[in-house]
């Protein structure tokens, strides 16, 4: 894990989110790398789509909830833009889940469902955090990580016969500028970093779970 205390003032809050994502985000997980390759089994893609639908597909979702609570008033415009984009992402995931068919039969389904519910609740807790910058960091990490997750969704769309749809997120430059401004004090920078770390940890656990399920099916 990145030592944010060492990095301190020398990096912006967005720099910290980006560095955390490179080290601990979805892009670094071997199972996701497999899922976005041509070698991915359709049942594994289906499982991933259904898991993402469970964690991120139900309203309000992290971005919308963070906008609703909006502990950092200066974040509201950026959060609104991200939340609006995720309305489209939820619709896309729902389309993919329908096209992918039922969740593939896998040992330990009850435990999986409990883990996915726990992950969703953890994200809801981040969105409601009263610590200024925490929800901002979680949403910033979600936007950063979603770039890689989108590769999976678009790959699944092609596999299951769905036309990929363009994402509607704010530009990377706009997000970078907003997060840098929102984490411009030592306290808010630490909170942004904490929120981002928690989001990446949830996604890392999700890919670990899906990797274990794929192994159990292939047994």
Identify what each model region corresponds to.
Residues 1-32, 110-115:
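Acidic, low-complexity proline/glycine-rich segments
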Residues 146-149, 153-156, 178-185, 199, ...:
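Hydrophobic alpha-helical segments
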């Amino acid at each position: 894990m990145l030592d944010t205390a060492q990095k301190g003032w020398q990096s912006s809050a967005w720099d910290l989110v980006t560095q955390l994502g490179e080290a601990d985000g979805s892009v670094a997980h071997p199972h996701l790398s497999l899922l976005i390759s041509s070698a991915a089994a359709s049942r594994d893609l289906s499982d991933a789509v259904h898991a993402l639908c469970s964690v991120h597909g139900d309203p309000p979702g992290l971005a919308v909830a963070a906008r609703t609570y909006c502990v950092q008033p200066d974040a509201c415009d950026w959060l609104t833009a991200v939340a609006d984009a995720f309305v489209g992402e939820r619709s896309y995931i729902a389309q993919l889940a329908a096209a992918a068919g039922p969740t593939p039969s896998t040992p330990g389904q009850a435990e999986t469902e409990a883990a996915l519910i726990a992950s969703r609740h953890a994200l809801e807790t981040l969105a409601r955090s009263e610590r200024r910058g925490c929800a901002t960091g979680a949403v910033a990490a979600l936007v950063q990580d979603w770039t890689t997750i989108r590769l999976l969704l678009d790959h699944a769309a092609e596999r299951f016969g769905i036309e990929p749809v363009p994402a509607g997120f704010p530009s990377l430059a706009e997000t970078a500028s907003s997060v840098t401004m929102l984490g411009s004090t030592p306290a808010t920078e630490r909170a942004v970093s904490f929120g981002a770390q928690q989001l990446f940890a949830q996604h890392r656990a999700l890919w670990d779970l899906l990797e274990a399920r794929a192994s159990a099916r292939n047994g």
